[in-house]
Amino acid sequence: MSKPPDLLLRLLRGAPRQRVCTLFIIGFKFTFFVSIMIYWHVVGEPKEKGQLYNLPAEIPCPTLTPPTPPSHGPTPGNIFFLETSDRTNPNFLFMCSVESAARTHPESHVLVLMKGLPGGNASLPRHLGISLLSCFPNVQMLPLDLRELFQDTPLADWYAAVQGRWEPYLLPVLSDASRIALMWKFGGIYLDTDFIVLKNLRNLTNVLGTQSRYVLNGAFLAFERRHEFMALCMRDFVDHYNGWIWGHQGPQLLTRVFKKWCSIRSLAESRSCRGVTTLPPEAFYPIPWQDWKKYFEDINPEELPRLLSATYAVHVWNKKSQGTRFEATSRALLAQLHARYCPTTHEAMKMYL
């Protein structure tokens, strides 16, 4: 049996009052750690109550799909989606995100990088989402190798170190790191998998969206390959790393770097400087996260174009909205967005939800 550390033994040999305090602190920390571990590993993330689990593995492809772009593989100008967990069964919002991007960008490769996909010549998993997205010839699903992605970037050593420890927000932090590495290495457009794309985004370069008057958001990024702004983001990611604060490596990082980039103290002072532009909230975040329930409220279909006239893509705030049920054929805003911008996914929802 291994001996306790010398420091712990010295603490326990102290005065009775000191021993009681020491034991209390050790017990509290141990209980707190065990509670978090049990919650994270046993309870896990909330189930998606709005999606059934007896879905078919395949779906007939629609007759009309975007044409196949001529090139193959990651090249500048691609549209990227990321799944940094091991999940390989895209939900309906994930499907709609990719389909809407594919339909609005028929000339582009839409690359869905999934950590859980097998490498080599292995076939794709048999899931409804994989089958549906395979219908679009400009959509390509590829395995995500994080070690390879971070290689030759400031993130490589950080990734090697973080493998050996537990952190509460590791999955979103990995996603934050992956998107800036993708933009640095390949350039193009990055989108979270809870976006619904309304318009072509090809005219946006070196652009990110404003979430509120105080913070930017990296759920959408559009940058040239090896842009210095992304290099600064990677360096800040490592130099000021804190995986225990939600958003510190994502929205807060982008906000910090943009303020340094423009030498400003407030986002209100500048929306564009040194070739990098921030778009107002209505461009990508027309409904604030605090009002996410509005996506499930009925609206008049005639009001939709007016409401979204200044919007490129709609962020649905899946962290808040996941599990919320709605009828695919209803007049809810989200149902109407599905019907208009991802009709193939919408048909599947009507059949299986």
From Swiss-Prot:
Recorded GO MF terms: galactosyltransferase activity; lactosylceramide 4-alpha-galactosyltransferase activity
Keywords: Glycoprotein, Glycosyltransferase, Golgi apparatus, Lipid biosynthesis, Lipid metabolism, Membrane, Signal-anchor, Transferase, Transmembrane, Transmembrane helix
Cellular localization per UniProt: Golgi apparatus membrane
InterPro entries on file: A1-4-GlycosylTfrase_dom (IPR007652), Glycosyltransf_32 (IPR051981), GlycoTrfase_DXD_sugar-bd_CS (IPR007577), Nucleotide-diphossugar_trans (IPR029044)
Its membrane topology: Single-pass type II membrane protein
Segments carrying motif DXD motif: 192-194
Chief place where the protein resides: Golgi
Catalytic activity reported: a beta-D-Gal-(1->4)-beta-D-Glc-(1<->1)-Cer(d18:1(4E)) + UDP-alpha-D-galactose = a globoside Gb3Cer (d18:1(4E)) + UDP + H(+); a beta-D-Gal-(1<->1')-ceramide + UDP-alpha-D-galactose = alpha-D-Gal-(1->4)-beta-D-Gal-(1<->1')-Cer + UDP + H(+)
Record's comment describing the protein's domains: The conserved DXD motif is involved in enzyme activity.
The protein's name in its UniProt record: Lactosylceramide 4-alpha-galactosyltransferase
